[in-house]
């Protein structure tokens, strides 16, 4: 997390405030950590929740570098068609599939049913 300095002039006095500025990756990790057990989200959905629907690729890049897969369940993120990630960074497609199945999510031909399992957060 980065910090910034904000100066406010009030009644002729300068008041300095230190503010925390969250990086895009930190926003992504925070949102992904909220996806509940037994649910999935799409890259575009996470991007939109970060403030820009065009950040879907950035979401993928951030999750590929996930610093804490136990707390940030990147395996719960799929593409806009519900398809699993071919290049899942933490063991490949089979591991992602197994993790989702262990949460009760049906995976058929490498896809999940978004109507049934998509998080509406």
Language-model region placement:
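Intrinsically disordered, low-complexity regions enriched in Ser/Pro/Gly/Gln/His and often acidic
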Residues: 5-6, 112
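Composition-driven detection of intrinsically disordered, low-complexity segments
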Residues: 7, 15-18
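Generic signature of intrinsically disordered, low-complexity, basic-rich segments
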Residues: 2-3, 37
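Short hydrophobic alpha-helical segments enriched in small aliphatic residues
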Residues: 3, 9-12
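Nucleic acid-binding interface residues in structured DNA/RNA-binding domains
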Residues: 18-121
